[in-house]
């Protein structure tokens, strides 16, 4: 059985300007941003090709103007690409008629943006129910479904509040609940937490990870915050001037940067934030006595370091089936924290 990615981009370009298509054809796809800029064009996305698997969270990041939001708008076809192909579950977006595209967005896609865009005259419950009613769901059913979403994002008790009565973090929870109400398979999020205070942003990231653990959506998430990308991503794409400089796992992005630009982006990142236990564990030694405390092999070292360092004995490392696959010694954790990444 062949593999079909949920999202696939094949040589996607987005260039703004009157002569964009003509210049792109003449360049044979070899786009130089400076040359196009001198001709009055702006390169938003430059030859982007990648796939996103079912249930995967791809985080796209870069500085302002790098093209990350433009790429997201092309994937959702809020903006038409200048060239290239974009497929959603094997469907060519460019071949869809307007009605088909609307139905795809209504039934398959959820979107959350930095601006909460809540309707000020509607309550939390009414805001969440609104897209369901647009789809034709009966009012009673839409309210019931909206209440389920209220509980899912932890706002029960505030369902009758108006947006002005909520904090920024609570308003963004409403936006998330509203986007989830239609049960989308694909979730697009464009810097949803960047306007929030640091403590609230951390809370929302935790909530987001909890939701993803339950719902297993296919996600494309835009951010300019590298720490946020490290916390959330299965894979990270780093963009510069419309080009994807590197697309890889968080650990490989940090430990094996593909370009000088990526290296500068990641050089200050503590290794304990990206290295997983399996990269520093030892093989199982049947003669070795281990602690009762256990860790999973895919845990990030930073999240278990304190607990491991308080143990007097090595710690057993478990796989996804809770089988012991290795042991973790405190000395390896100390090396990661204070003396380099100590990969095996």
Regions found by a protein language model. Name each.
Residues 290-320, 327-344:
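The conserved cystathionine-beta-synthase
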Residues 247-248, 256, 327:
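ABC ATPase "signature
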Residues 162-166, 170:
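Conserved ABC ATPase signature
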Residues 76:
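Helix-to-loop junction immediately C-terminal to a conserved catalytic motif
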Residues 181-185:
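A short, proline-enriched helix->beta-strand linker immediately N-terminal to the Walker B motif
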Residues 84-92:
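Conserved ABC transporter NBD signature motif
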Residues 8, 25-34, 91-92, 133, ...:
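Conserved ABC ATPase "signature" region
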């Amino acid at each position: 059985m062949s593999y079909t990615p949920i999202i696939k981009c094949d040589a996607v370009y987005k260039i703004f300007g009157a002569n964009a298509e003509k210049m792109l054809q003449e360049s044979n796809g070899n786009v130089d941003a400076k040359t196009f800029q001198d001709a009055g064009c702006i390169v938003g996305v430059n030859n982007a090709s990648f796939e996103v698997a079912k249930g995967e969270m791809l985080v796209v990041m870069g500085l302002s103007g790098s093209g990350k939001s433009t790429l997201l708008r092309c994937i959702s076809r809020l903006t038409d690409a200048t060239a290239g192909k974009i497929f959603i579950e094997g469907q060519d977006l460019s071949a869809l008629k307007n009605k088909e595209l609307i139905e795809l967005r209504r039934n398959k896609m959820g979107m959350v943006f930095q601006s909460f865009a809540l309707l000020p005259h509607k309550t939390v419950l009414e805001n969440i129910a609104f897209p369901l009613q647009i789809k034709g769901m009966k009012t009673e059913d839409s309210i019931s479904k909206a209440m389920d979403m209220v509980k899912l994002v932890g706002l029960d008790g505030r369902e009758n509040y108006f947006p002005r009565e909520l904090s920024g973090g609570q308003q963004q929870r409403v936006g998330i609940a509203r986007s989830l109400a239609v049960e989308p398979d694909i979730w697009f999020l464009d810097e949803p937490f960047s306007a929030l205070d640091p403590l609230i942003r951390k809370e929302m990231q935790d909530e987001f990870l909890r939701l993803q653990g339950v719902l297993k959506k296919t996600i494309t998430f835009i951010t300019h915050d590298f720490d946020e990308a490290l916390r959330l991503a299965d894979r990270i794409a780093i963009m510069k001037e419309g080009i994807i400089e590197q697309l890889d796992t968080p650990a490989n992005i940090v430990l094996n940067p593909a370009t000088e630009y990526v290296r500068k982006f990641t050089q200050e990142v503590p290794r304990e934030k990206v290295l997983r236990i399996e990269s520093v564990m030892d093989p199982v030694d049947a003669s070795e006595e281990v602690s009762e405390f256990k860790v999973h092999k895919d845990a990030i070292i930073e999240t278990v370091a304190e607990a491991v360092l308080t143990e007097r004995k090595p710690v057993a490392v478990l796989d996804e089936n809770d089988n012991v696959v290795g042991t973790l010694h405190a000395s390896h954790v100390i090396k990661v924290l204070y003396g380099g990444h100590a990969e095996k």
